[in-house]
């Protein structure tokens, strides 16, 4: 599993180098692309190049909406899926509702519920969600299970102030087993 964050593609040079490198990854490598809040700063050519190779594109609702507007402005009617392979998946983070997974272009959207917890701070929650999802994939889980892990990690991340510390594997597994989120600082 290789993760490329759009925040690393905000300069023309970095966008070109990173998107072309990622596009050249061998097929046995799972490429996860995260859209990031810097979506408008990424050159369109980089999106076109990297989406054509991506296995999973993950984004927040705001990032998805912003990117959709950029792509449509460039090519009337274009969507994120226009640039992706039909067999690639999308994961959209929808805040307190968890995330939505579409495993391939014509697949139904699967809602993966969040774990309920009082929200102390949302700093770093997107990064935690992406990292937990990638960890699940590395551990050999299917994407739906990896997204459930990501939701558990995200719930732990928002349970305390600050983006640090990030949840441990044991803490995530405890949430998955019990459904209960506890403040990881206690």
Locate the predicted segments by residue.
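Conserved beta-alpha-beta core of the PfkB/ribokinase-like small-molecule kinase fold
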Residues: 1-78, 97-98
């Amino acid at each position: 599993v290789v993760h490329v964050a759009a925040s690393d593609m905000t300069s023309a040079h970095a966008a070109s180098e990173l998107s072309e490198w990622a596009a050249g990854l061998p097929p046995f490598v799972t490429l996860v692309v995260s859209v990031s809040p810097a979506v408008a700063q990424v050159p369109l050519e980089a999106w076109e190049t990297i989406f054509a190779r991506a296995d999973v594109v993950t984004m927040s609702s705001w990032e998805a909406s912003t990117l959709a507007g950029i792509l449509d402005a460039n090519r009337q009617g274009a969507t994120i899926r226009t640039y992706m392979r039909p067999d690639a998946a999308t994961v959209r983070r929808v805040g307190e509702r968890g995330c939505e997974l579409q495993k391939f272009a014509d697949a139904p959207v699967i809602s993966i519920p969040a774990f309920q917890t009082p929200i102390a701070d949302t700093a770093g929650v997107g990064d935690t969600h992406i990292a937990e999802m990638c960890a699940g994939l590395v551990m050999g889980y299917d994407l739906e299970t990896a997204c459930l892990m990501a939701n558990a990690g995200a719930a732990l991340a928002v349970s305390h102030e600050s983006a640090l510390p990030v949840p441990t594997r044991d803490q995530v597994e405890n949430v998955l087993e019990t459904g209960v989120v506890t403040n990881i600082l206690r």
